[in-house]
Amino acid sequence: MQTIAIVDYGMGNVRSVQKALEHVAPNDKCILTSDPKIIQESDRVVFPGQGAMGSCMRALELNDLISEIKLSSKSKPFLGICLGLQLLFGYSEENNGTNGLSIVPGDVIKFNNNDLKIPHMGWNNVNQVNNHPLWNKIDNNSRFYSVHSYYVNPTDTSCVVGMTEYGHSFASAIAIDKIFAVQFHPEKSQSDGLQLLRNFVEWN
């Protein structure tokens, strides 16, 4: 039995992530936690998030989680979801400029096309532009559920493994070493989302 730590810092519906993981990994221990020690001792980490990036960074600081998130992202399988993807980057345009965790070089940019509905909300295709174990048994251009007003712009585009079209193409999934992070919500994306979580649980 392995332990999967779901980082709970008060931002977003982490219980839905926990329930989805418990469904695909019934023999594993899926813990909601804000305790850096539990995260450190876990086998895998899931880093979800919703809301404003500035508020999330303050919550991470208050819970003394920043150093452990940085360590875990380099030492064990690590899945970022939605704002959990954006927080990995160095800088966001949100809140008149917000610094992130600077784990992944690049920026977080607001959709600025006046013809688009913001936030980008609903189902959209993800083009698997690079192979990765977390795409196993998921058809290319499968649809996933998203809710976001900002998108990530990595400095090194070789880390991009998924692209989505909304006004223009943007990175909706990245992978660097032990990190896999997505803009969409696998826990809300029915069978393909559950398959991605299953792949994460089995990824070595």
Task: Report residues per predicted region.
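Short acidic/histidine-rich motifs immediately flanking catalytic phosphotransfer sites
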Residues: 39-49
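Short acidic low-complexity segments
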Residues: 29-41
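Extreme N-terminal starter segment of soluble prokaryotic enzymes
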Residues: 1-5
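Short, surface-exposed beta-strand/loop micro-motifs that present aromatic residues
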Residues: 168-175
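Acyltransferase
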Residues: 182-204
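Cysteine-nucleophile active-site neighborhood
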Residues: 51-123
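Pocket-forming structural segment of enzyme catalytic cores
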Residues: 90-166
